[in-house]
Amino acid sequence: MHILIPAAGMGKRMGASHNKLRLQLLGKPLLAWTLAAVAAAEAIEWIGVIGQPEDFPIWEALLEDLNLRQPVHLITGGETRQASVFHGLQALPKTAEQVLIHDGARCLATPDLINRCAQALGTYAGLIAAVPVKDTIKIVNREGVVVQTPERDSLWAAQTPQGFRVEPLRIAHEMAVAKGWEVTDDAALFERLGYAVHIVLGEETNLKITTPSDLPLAERILQHRREQEQDTLG
């Protein structure tokens, strides 16, 4: 399985002046945790990290330290996440038939989740990791007035990995460029072409590191996992 990792986020909401994936989490850059989880997933055979050239020397040094078993390719991204994924699709090997796309900032995803998404691509043309929404969601108009309360049973919070067959996803991105479509995830493009996108149960801990308050929470989750591993070994 091939996987693309968008890793060009500037982290404005983190208050950082540089790529937020360079921020430290228990002594390692955020991206190191993401890459370690991806590399530990048995299904993954090829990794593409999509970023900006100014970060590449840092990522190259990181990759040397990690010494992952899979080949890792650094791919120059675009001005938006959507454009970056489009660039990543162009960089896939010609033999790639399926691809997972996983946000670099989701550094808490487990190898199990990544493997389950890869396995599900054997059945589905498109899928996303997602979890049921716990809160009641309100649809609000521009005046700040609630206009609808959707049934919570039908609402899921999208995560990554998201997985697709390569050719229809590439076509969807080409159409997006031609028609000026702008979406927040790749599944939305897939849906616009009429393809079904299936749900793979995600993980409550699969947070996207977005604001400063996410960092201490991520540290607690990772520390808890370390303690569990030590208890298992000990």
UniProtKB/Swiss-Prot annotation:
Matches recorded under PROSITE patterns: ISPD (PS01295)
MF GO annotations: 2-C-methyl-D-erythritol 4-phosphate cytidylyltransferase activity
Taxonomy, superkingdom: Bacteria
InterPro entries to which the protein is assigned, alphabetical: IspD (IPR001228), IspD/TarI (IPR034683), IspD/TarI_cytidylyltransf_bact (IPR050088), ISPD_synthase_CS (IPR018294), Nucleotide-diphossugar_trans (IPR029044)
Pathway in which this enzyme or protein is active: Isoprenoid biosynthesis; isopentenyl diphosphate biosynthesis via DXP pathway; isopentenyl diphosphate from 1-deoxy-D-xylulose 5-phosphate: step 2/6
Catalytic activity: 2-C-methyl-D-erythritol 4-phosphate + CTP + H(+) = 4-CDP-2-C-methyl-D-erythritol + diphosphate
Xref: SUPFAM superfamilies: Nucleotide-diphospho-sugar transferases
Residues the UniProt record annotates as site (Transition state stabilizer): R13, K20
Pfam families associated with the record: IspD
EC number(s) from the headed UniProt entry: 2.7.7.60
Broad class of enzyme this protein falls into: transferase
HAMAP family documented for this protein: IspD
NCBIfam families xrefs: ispD
Protein name, UniProt field: 2-C-methyl-D-erythritol 4-phosphate cytidylyltransferase
Source species of the chain: Thermosynechococcus vestitus (strain NIES-2133 / IAM M-273 / BP-1)
Gene: ispD
